[in-house]
Amino acid sequence: MSVYFPIHCSDYLRSAEMTEVMMNAPSMEEIGLSPRKDGLSYQIFPDPSDFDRCCKLKDRLPSIVVEPTEGEVESGELRWPPEEFLVQEDEQDNCEETTNEKKDQ
């Protein structure tokens, strides 16, 4: 069983209420980003001069050199590609070489 309560409110009345809200709301000029009482101002976007100063401090990125090591894998260390993958690749290469040799003959 549903209960229906009709709301006796015309669209004109709702429109009048919205107009009243819009008329009483502060304008964008009043909302503007003015300095606060403590003297600090709001800043949304970074100051371009800060960007220039930051770039001058960073002439270049630090370089990190990583050299591969050929040694025993420590316990728990993962290597890529895994040795099983390398063995499978070698087998596939050998199969391809064999088929190419048969085609050449």
UniProtKB/Swiss-Prot annotation:
It is found in: Nucleus; Cytoplasm. Residues 86-98 have a biased composition (Acidic residues). The keyword Cell inner membrane does not apply. Its main location: nucleus. One of its GO terms (cellular component) is nucleus. Expressed at highest levels in heart, and at lower levels in brain, spleen, lung, liver and kidney. Keywords: Cytoplasm, Developmental protein, Nucleus, Phosphoprotein, Transcription, Transcription regulation. The modification Phosphoserine is found at residue 63. It holds the Pfam family Lbh. Residues 68-105 are annotated as: Disordered. Residues 18-103 form the LBH domain. GO terms for biological process: mammary gland development; mammary gland epithelial cell differentiation; negative regulation of DNA-templated transcription; negative regulation of intracellular estrogen receptor signaling pathway; negative regulation of stem cell differentiation; positive regulation of DNA-templated transcription; positive regulation of mammary stem cell proliferation; positive regulation of somatic stem cell division. Modulates the activity of key transcription factors involved in cardiogenesis. Belongs to the LBH family. Mice overexpressing Lbh in heart exhibit severe cardiac abnormalities and dysfunction. This is Protein LBH.
